[in-house]
From Swiss-Prot:
UniProt pathway annotation: Amino-acid biosynthesis; L-lysine biosynthesis via DAP pathway; (S)-tetrahydrodipicolinate from L-aspartate: step 4/4
Gene giving rise to this polypeptide: dapB
Organism listed in the record: Anaeromyxobacter dehalogenans (strain 2CP-1 / ATCC BAA-258)
Name of the molecule in the record: 4-hydroxy-tetrahydrodipicolinate reductase
Binding-site list for NADP(+): R35
Gene Ontology biological-process annotations: diaminopimelate biosynthetic process; lysine biosynthetic process via diaminopimelate
Localization terms from the record: Cytoplasm
Amino acid sequence: MTKVVVTGAAGRMGTQIVRLVRATPGLAVSGAVERAGSPAIGKDAGTLAGGEPLGVAVVDDLAKALAGADVVIDFTSHEASVRHAQACAAAGVALVIGSTGFTPDAKAKVAEAARKVPVVLSPNMSVGVNVVFELVRQAARVLGDGYDVEIVEIHHKHKRDAPSGTAVRLGEVAAEALGRAPADALAYTRHGILGERPPWQIGIQTLRGGDVVGEHTVFFCGEGERVEITHRATSREQFARGAARAAAWLPGKPPGVYDMADVLGLRGGK
């Protein structure tokens, strides 16, 4: 039985993950963590998730929950995820990170922790989205420089980072497939008199409103035709399912940074 600690256990994603982990054969919730001062501290993680008690009380310090754990699932913030990665590295516990908004410095700190333990770092745990990453890669390679690439994403009004980590990753995938440096190619939310669109540019536009779980469309705009690849998330459950799948796959892997393509076998695994 793989023992799983869930951070952010009282949040929207955390409660979904607790429910999915307890329903997944071979996985068990062994720990639950929330921020200091949360009203969830001391409460049962199973009850908070809307189910029967698990006998797992929510604590305010990840280190307290790591004893005997095999893997941590972390959907919090990139700042908290860095601290959690460092705690997991110190304890020798694998880590699945679904947080977004990572800065280069934060990613470097996660990579440093991954020198000691295996880490899955993915901006989107959905199986469907990770298939879309591969479809975009293939489309960019086949269509080439004759098609302009644009990305539009929309999420609920409570999402704090923009653009989404998934939109950025879609842009990176397209840029890499076209032989462009993502740092140079990606352009965000245009405004003003900018002149003609540079042919090497990949635009990313952000929308926020309502209760939209998540939608991403990649446009390949050519002369006389347009190809669109779209993914629509209608429930957070599919993110939790992907995270549970990653948690079952990761323990026992060599230290290093993995992503969902590795988990799903979409390319040669590490």
